Amino acid sequence: MNIGILGIQGDIEEHEEMIKKINHAPKRIRTIEDLKNIDALIIPGGESSTMGKLMKTYGFIEALKNADLPILGTCAGMVLLSKGTGKEQPLLELMDITINRNAYGSQKYSFESELELNGIKINAVFIRAPTVDKILSDEVEIIAKEGGNIVGVKQGKYMAIAFHPELSEEGYKFYEYFLNEVVKND
């Protein structure tokens, strides 16, 4: 499968390496034309306000709202998939959730935590991580919690997580999970 990684800001190279590790082809997405011929898209972590502005400037907001494409959002990607954050910023609004940005505090409060997603254990890296504040419809499934906070959700062809699987040695397991749960079932 060809897995696109939005290449305007964030942990792009790390996601590419994980996609290669599970024997799929990563494709860096820099323009809306690059969205052709991919089977799924990853929106990486980064700074969600900056990413949202760049996505709007380059036409990604409208293009992705109209695309029939499975999407994984990690950290800032989770924020961008949400309906709202309590702050004015461009969002895709594809998932029926609202977000608490930087719920765990500043970068100095980054941490790792063992999470289990449907029997898959991974060491999750949280950096200035968001959490789901509200679930707005029954279509949203909780797939991960950390300390009582919702840090992973799935809705149809969209999956959003607060952590960085690309920074964990066994993070490739999460990409396999995404491809099996969302992309292959689409």
Swiss-Prot record:
The keyword Phosphoprotein does not apply. The active site is at C75, H164, E166. InterPro entries: Class_I_gatase-like, PdxT/SNO, PdxT/SNO_CS. Keywords: Glutamine amidotransferase, Hydrolase, Lyase, Pyridoxal phosphate. L-glutamine binds at G46, E47, S48, R101, I127, R128. Its EC number is 4.3.3.6, 3.5.1.2. The keyword Nucleus does not apply. Pfam families: SNO. SUPFAM superfamilies: Class I glutamine amidotransferase-like. GO terms for molecular function: glutaminase activity; pyridoxal 5'-phosphate synthase (glutamine hydrolysing) activity. It catalyses: aldehydo-D-ribose 5-phosphate + D-glyceraldehyde 3-phosphate + L-glutamine = pyridoxal 5'-phosphate + L-glutamate + phosphate + 3 H2O + H(+); L-glutamine + H2O = L-glutamate + NH4(+). GO terms for cellular component: cytosol; glutaminase complex. GO terms for biological process: glutamine catabolic process; pyridoxal phosphate biosynthetic process; pyridoxine metabolic process. Pathway: Cofactor biosynthesis; pyridoxal 5'-phosphate biosynthesis. It comes from the Archaea. Catalyzes the hydrolysis of glutamine to glutamate and ammonia as part of the biosynthesis of pyridoxal 5'-phosphate. The resulting ammonia molecule is channeled to the active site of PdxS. Belongs to the glutaminase PdxT/SNO family. In the presence of PdxS, forms a dodecamer of heterodimers. Only shows activity in the heterodimer. This is Pyridoxal 5'-phosphate synthase subunit PdxT. It comes from Methanococcus aeolicus (strain ATCC BAA-1280 / DSM 17508 / OCM 812 / Nankai-3). The gene is pdxT.
